[in-house]
């Protein structure tokens, strides 16, 4: 019998749903083993019945549930609770669901400050009232899914990788565990590290030094070239079977999208230590808290005291 699969998306761009499609041919094999019973991005399933006849939202029971996106409003929260009730195994899909992702950068502001900026003060907006009566009420901040309901598995990344999604679903169907990497991005980076002092950070628009066509193992570490790279404080795994991290393959620094090395890790502390080893002063970074927690702000970023 095919396993029943439900999926919901909250505060997210939709990239993790595209990742499911990007699984490619292996997705055809997976679809023979699962029955999709709820997935708003693909199918029209009304939460309160097809004609709105139900008083409470309802999601079909499922063996596996996927949630992408962080929890930003009260409807997201209620849906997360319903998914947890109806799904035997619940997976947080992507860094927004795992750690809050980019939307959680708003946690450094109060809800009122966010609404005022978006609906009254942005350059392209015609100032008007807040649409609080027409849309679900915002929560006080962006929450990771695991802060609201227990989660059985996390698949980080912005977006996560097709290989990881396929591997996790296959493992579940076969009754196997699917552990995340315990190493850092730096541990899987093939570039040359000499721990030489740098001194000054460079802008990302400046081109790093490398020889086109030559292997990455001949390129000097991007952070040692003076570019801010979050590899020391970021969980490995984005490279998949290729090993080499995705951003590094494109000659770009790690942005930190796979989140912290562990649940208790502090990316800001880890990055401070990494920067000090090559003589970089963290004070060169204007917004250190948000920069080092760019994808992991749900439980880490709060409004700063106003001066």
Q: Could you tell me what each predicted segment is?
A:
Residues 74:
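Short substrate-entry loop that stabilizes the transition state in hydrolases
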Residues 1-66, 77, 81-89, 112-155, ...:
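Iron-sulfur (Fe-S) cluster-binding modules
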Residues 96-101:
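Short gly/pro/ser/thr-enriched loop/turn and capping motifs at secondary-structure boundaries
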Residues 103-106, 269:
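Active-site-proximal loop->helix
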Residues 69-71, 95:
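Short glycine-/small-residue-rich Rossmann-like dinucleotide-binding loops
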Residues 107-111:
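Short, hinge-like loop/turn segments at secondary-structure boundaries
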Residues 77, 102-103:
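A short acidic (Asp/Glu
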